[in-house]
């Protein structure tokens, strides 16, 4: 079920700017709306909302997360096939391909080059052919749980 925005929205627009699938609309200083058919339930909008007015599909409130505490994508070079699916899907162009020397052989692999821009939306994980190649992790290195599960918040 899609996330939704409560009436106490201040219209700051940050949720719309950070949404990886552009499913949030609204004017400055007016209530914003999430298009449920487009929402991927990633929770990124709620993790940026300064007034905590975004709720998941079960009606659970989401809360703002400090930028230094947000999970971001990391590539396990040894598992990356170089398929470029993650590069193509990343809405914020955080991932690029680079040449990596693995055991004396050169391969094109993904690299998260703009870590501060990554919102942890997990689109890269969803399209990765090898689920171990790219993982969204907390700053301490622990794998972040899937926030599309009910009751999980960034």
Where are these regions (language model features)?
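Hydrophobic face of beta-strands forming the core of extended beta-sheets/solenoids
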Residues: 5, 34-35, 75-76, 86, ...
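Intrinsically disordered, low-complexity Ser/Thr-rich linker and spacer segments
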Residues: 56-73, 144-145
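Iron-sulfur (Fe-S) cluster-binding modules
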Residues: 1-4, 131, 135-154
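Short linker/helix segments within small regulatory modules
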Residues: 28-34, 69, 102-117
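Tandem repeat domain/solenoid detector
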Residues: 36, 52, 71, 77-78
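Iron-sulfur cluster-binding cysteine motifs and their immediate structural context
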Residues: 14-29, 44-61, 85-103, 123-141
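Short pre-active-site segment immediately N-terminal to redox-active cysteine/selenocysteine motifs
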Residues: 8, 18, 37-38, 48, ...
């Amino acid at each position: 079920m899609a996330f939704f925005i409560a009436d106490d929205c201040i219209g700051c627009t940050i949720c719309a700017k950070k949404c990886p699938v552009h499913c949030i609309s609204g004017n400055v200083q007016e209530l914003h709306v999430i298009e449920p058919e487009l929402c991927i339930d990633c929770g990124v909008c709620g993790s940026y909302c300064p007034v905590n007015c975004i709720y998941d599909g079960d009606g659970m409130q989401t809360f703002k997360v400090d930028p230094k505490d947000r999970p971001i994508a990391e590539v396990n070079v040894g598992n990356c096939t170089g398929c470029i699916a993650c590069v193509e899907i990343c809405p914020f162009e955080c991932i690029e391909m680079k040449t990596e020397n693995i055991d004396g052989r050169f391969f094109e692999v993904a690299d998260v080059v703009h870590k501060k821009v990554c919102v942890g939306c997990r689109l890269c994980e969803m399209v990765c052919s090898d689920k171990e190649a790219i993982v969204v992790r907390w700053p301490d290195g622990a794998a972040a749980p899937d926030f599309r599960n009910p009751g999980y918040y960034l």
